[in-house]
C-alpha cells in the first residue's frame, strides 16, 4: 500500500467520523437547548428508524432501479465483448483479492462505468456501450480497477450511511419548526430549527468532499492493482472527457470555474466522437494545469486535472 493510498484512506475515514460527530452533535445541542423533553426525543426516535429503513431499502433494491434507468443487462456469452470483459474483470478482481462481480452492459452511448450492488442483487460492475467504443482493452482494465476499488472499499455503503446525517438533521429541524409545541422558548426553537435545516444543506459540501476523497482513493487503487494502471487511467479519463465534446469546461481558460463531476457530466452529455482526437492535448494540459483549490468544490468528483496529476505522481513513485 502506497503512502498516498494510506493518506487518502485515513483522511476519508477521519472526515466520515467528523461528519457523524458534527451531525449528532448538532442534534444533541438542539435537544439540550429545548430541555431534552420527551416529545423531542420521541421525535428523534421515530425519525431515525424511518430514515435507516429508507436507506436500507435504497441499498437493497437500488441496483434494480439503476438497471432500469441505464438499461443494463448481464453480459452474455454470445456477446462479442464477453471474453474480453470477463477476462479483464476476473483478473482485476483477483488482483484486489475480492470475488469477481457480475459484469453488466449499459445500453447507453455515454462513455462511463460504475460499480454498484447489494446483498440481494450481488456486486456488479457495468460498462456502457460508449465506453467500449472509445477505449482500448488496457484502458478499460484501468477503469475497471477504479470501479473495483469502490467495491473493495465499500464506498456505496459508506456514502449511504453518511448521506443519512443531513437528511436526519433537515427533517428533525423541519418537524420542530412546524410541531407547534414550543412553549416559552418559541423564538429560540424556531431559530434552532432554521439553523438545523441550513446546516443540513451545508453538510452536502462535506459529503461532496468525502466522495472526492473516495474517488481519488479508487484512482490510486487502479494504479496499484493494474499493470500500468496510472498511465492507462490517465488516458482513459482524457478520452472519456474528450468524447463528450465538453472539454472547454476543463481547459486552462476556465480553470477557476467550479466544475461538475466527470460522472455527472457524462450522464448529461451526448458523446462527440470527433472530439476524441484531442485527448492527448487535453491530457498534456491537465498534467501542468494550475487548478484552484475550490475548482471542484461543488462536484462529487475531483477536477480531472487533479486526478491526472495525482496519477502522474504515482507513475513516478
UniProtKB/Swiss-Prot annotation:
The chain crosses the membrane at residues 14-34, 41-61, 158-178, 189-209. Its EC number is 3.4.24.-. The active site is at residue 147. One of its GO terms (cellular component) is plasma membrane. One of its GO terms (molecular function) is zinc ion binding. Its main location: membrane. It is found in: Cell membrane. GO terms for biological process: proteolysis. Binds 1 zinc ion per subunit. Keywords: Cell membrane, Hydrolase, Membrane, Metal-binding, Metalloprotease, Protease, Transmembrane, Transmembrane helix, Zinc. Its cofactor is Zn(2+). The keyword Acyltransferase does not apply. Zn(2+) binds at residues 146, 150, 215. Pfam families: Peptidase_M48. InterPro entries: HtpX_protease, Pept_M48_protease_HtpX, Peptidase_M48. It is a multi-pass membrane protein. NCBIfam families: PRK01265.1. Belongs to the peptidase M48B family. This is Protease HtpX homolog. It comes from Thermoplasma acidophilum (strain ATCC 25905 / DSM 1728 / JCM 9062 / NBRC 15155 / AMRC-C165). The lineage of its organism: Archaea, Methanobacteriati, Thermoplasmatota, Thermoplasmata, Thermoplasmatales.
Amino acid at each position: 500500500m502506497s503512502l498516498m493510498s494510506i493518506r487518502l484512506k485515513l483522511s476519508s475515514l477521519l472526515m466520515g467520523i467528523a461528519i457523524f460527530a458534527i451531525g449528532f452533535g448538532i442534534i444533541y445541542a438542539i435537544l439540550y437547548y429545548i430541555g431534552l423533553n420527551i416529545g423531542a426525543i420521541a421525535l428523534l426516535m421515530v425519525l431515525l428508524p424511518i430514515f435507516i429503513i429508507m436507506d436500507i431499502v435504497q441499498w437493497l433494491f437500488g441496483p434494480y432501479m439503476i438497471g432500469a434507468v441505464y438499461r443494463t443487462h448481464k453480459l452474455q456469452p454470445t456477446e462479442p465483448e464477453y471474453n474480453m470483459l470477463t477476462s479483464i474483470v476476473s483478473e482485476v478482481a483477483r488482483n484486489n483479492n475480492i470475488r469477481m462481480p457480475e459484469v453488466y452492459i449499459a445500453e447507453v452511448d455515454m462513455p462511463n462505468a460504475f460499480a454498484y450492488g447489494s446483498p440481494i442483487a450481488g456486486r456488479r460492475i457495468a460498462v456502457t456501450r460508449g465506453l467500449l467504443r472509445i477505449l482500448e482493452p488496457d484502458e478499460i482494465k484501468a477503469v475497471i480497477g477504479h470501479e473495483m476499488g469502490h467495491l473493495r472499499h465499500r464506498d456505496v455503503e459508506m456514502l449511504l450511511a453518511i448521506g443519512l446525517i443531513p437528511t436526519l438533521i433537515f427533517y428533525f429541524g423541519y418537524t420542530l419548526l412546524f410541531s407547534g409545541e414550543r412553549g416559552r422558548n418559541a423564538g429560540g426553537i424556531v431559530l434552532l430549527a432554521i439553523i438545523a435545516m441550513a446546516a443540513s444543506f451545508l453538510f452536502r459540501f462535506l459529503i461532496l468532499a468525502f466522495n472526492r476523497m473516495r474517488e481519488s482513493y479508487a484512482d490510486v487503487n487502479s494504479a496499484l492493482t493494474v499493470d500500468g494502471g496510472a498511465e492507462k487511467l490517465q488516458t482513459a479519463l482524457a478520452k472519456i472527457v474528450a468524447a463528450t465534446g465538453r472539454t472547454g469546461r476543463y481547459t486552462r481558460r476556465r480553470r477557476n470555474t467550479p466544475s461538475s463531476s466527470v460522472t455527472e457530466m457524462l450522464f448529461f452529455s451526448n458523446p462527440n466522437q470527433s472530439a476524441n482526437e484531442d485527448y492527448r492535448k487535453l491530457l498534456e494540459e491537465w498534467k501542468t494545469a494550475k487548478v484552484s483549490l475550490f475548482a471542484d468544490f461543488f462536484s462529487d468528483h475531483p477536477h480531472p486535472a487533479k486526478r491526472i496529476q495525482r496519477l502522474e505522481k504515482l507513475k513516478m513513485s
